[in-house]
């Protein structure tokens, strides 16, 4: 089970607008990675809320927490309900069906990060990650992948190879021009 957010009307509408922009950006944009330049810019929140927006719009949606070093998504799961995660699958300990957490929110499933591995970049770059995304493409209408910040580690660039598009989240007020 997953804890939902209580968003105000304007915030919920902003996520709907982002969802609609993705839907109209092309026919084959099924797998989207979300990253940021630095930690604490809100990419995990955007990933979660965007995935929720797709699910609430009737699309079977999978959110993958690929930020295995510093996952904040584990706080979204209800205590005691998360058994296995992405790192269990990528290291060959579990099958994909074992790590997908089916939510009580219709059309919303999630893969939590799992325990911190000693070699995160190598794990997301291995064949099992690409195989997982291909399998998920056959089952889900939309796949959102929350990745580590691109300015900190290489994981997001490695993950982007199996994605159709990406979103760079920038913290509000962090950039001046």
What do these predicted regions represent?
Residues 2-177:
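P-loop NTP-binding module
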């Amino acid at each position: 089970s997953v804890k939902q957010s209580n968003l105000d009307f304007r915030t919920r509408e902003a996520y709907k607008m982002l969802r609609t922009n993705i839907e109209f950006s092309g026919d084959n944009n099924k797998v989207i990675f979300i990253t940021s330049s630095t930690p604490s810019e809100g990419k995990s929140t955007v990933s979660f809320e965007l995935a929720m927006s797709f699910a609430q719009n009737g699309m079977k949606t999978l959110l993958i927490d690929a930020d295995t070093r510093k996952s904040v998504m584990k706080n979204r799961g209800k205590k005691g309900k998360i058994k296995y995660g992405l790192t269990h699958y990528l290291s060959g300990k579990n099958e994909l069906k074992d790590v997908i957490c089916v939510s009580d929110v219709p059309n919303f499933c999630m893969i939590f990060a799992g325990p911190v591995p000693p070699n995160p970049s190598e794990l997301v770059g291995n064949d099992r990650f690409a195989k997982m995304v291909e399998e998920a493409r056959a089952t889900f209408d939309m796949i959102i992948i929350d990745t580590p910040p691109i300015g900190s580690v290489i994981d997001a660039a490695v993950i982007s190879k199996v994605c159709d598009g990406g979103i760079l989240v920038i913290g509000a007020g962090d950039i001046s021009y």
